[in-house]
Amino acid sequence: MSKPPPKPAKPGQVKVFRALFTFDPRTPDELYFEEGDILYISDTSDTNWWKGTCRGRTGLIPSNYVAEQAETIDHPMHEAAKRGNLSWLRECVENKVGINGLDKAGNTALYWACHGGHKDVVELLLNQPSVELNQQNKLGDTVLHAAAWKGYSDIVEMLLDKNARTDIRNNENKLALEMATNAQCASLLKRKQGTNVTRTLSNAEEYLDDDDSD
């Protein structure tokens, strides 16, 4: 029994597949790819021919081939981030795969990069203008919780430099600081929280001063 065809991509949403067989094009417009290649499908508006990219080349792929002879990769960004596969992640970014997508546990790709200690992957994701720093997963954890719990102080510092929030509590009512497993992570988080508290107090004092001047 043949499996049902994949759902068409929403406008602007890139769907990703892994080719199970090699495809030999018959016309110059068609895209050649080999077994195991990653296919980025960007346009499914034509029911017969989908527009896709593979290894930096763009062309047409018969939609029935994708349906019958390709494997859907639901969360390519997450897979790349978990493995610390920088080149695949960069390819996902270049092919406009959404960077803030959530897996079944509510995690972003950045969460998995922080959880795995993949500093180069974290850096690439943090350089994307639309990256979400404060997304909570189903356990209420943020990327900062993950990095602090795993003891990656260099990643904690990178997240704090991008102004990741330190005041978010997870489902166990714990801050990232309370999840920190080494002194260096704890010190960075304390310093950042101290700065935020000082700034808040300073703002409050200015507000009171304004009241007094009325």
From Swiss-Prot:
Could you list this entry's UniProt keywords, alphabetically sorted. Answer: ANK repeat, Cytoplasm, Repeat, SH3 domain
The record, for InterPro entries, names: Ankyrin_rpt, Ankyrin_rpt-contain_sf, SH3-like_dom_sf, SH3_domain
- Intrachain S-S bonds: none
- Record's Gene Ontology CC terms? cytoplasm
Which SMART domains does UniProt cross-reference here?
A: ANK, SH3
The answer to whether keyword Magnesium applies is no
Specify the domain of life of the species encoding this protein: Eukaryota
Compartments, as annotated in UniProt: Cytoplasm
Q: In which tissues is it expressed?
A: Ubiquitously expressed.
* Protein's UniProt keywords contain Repeat: yes
- Give the UniProt record's GO annotations in the biological process aspect: signal transduction
The residue spans of each ANK repeat are: 72-101, 105-135, 139-168
What residue stretches are annotated with the SH3 domain? Answer: 12-71
Write out the function statement from the record.
Induces bone resorption, acting probably through a signaling cascade which results in the secretion of factor(s) enhancing osteoclast formation and activity.
Q: What is this protein called?
A: Osteoclast-stimulating factor 1
Name its species: Monopterus albus (Swamp eel)
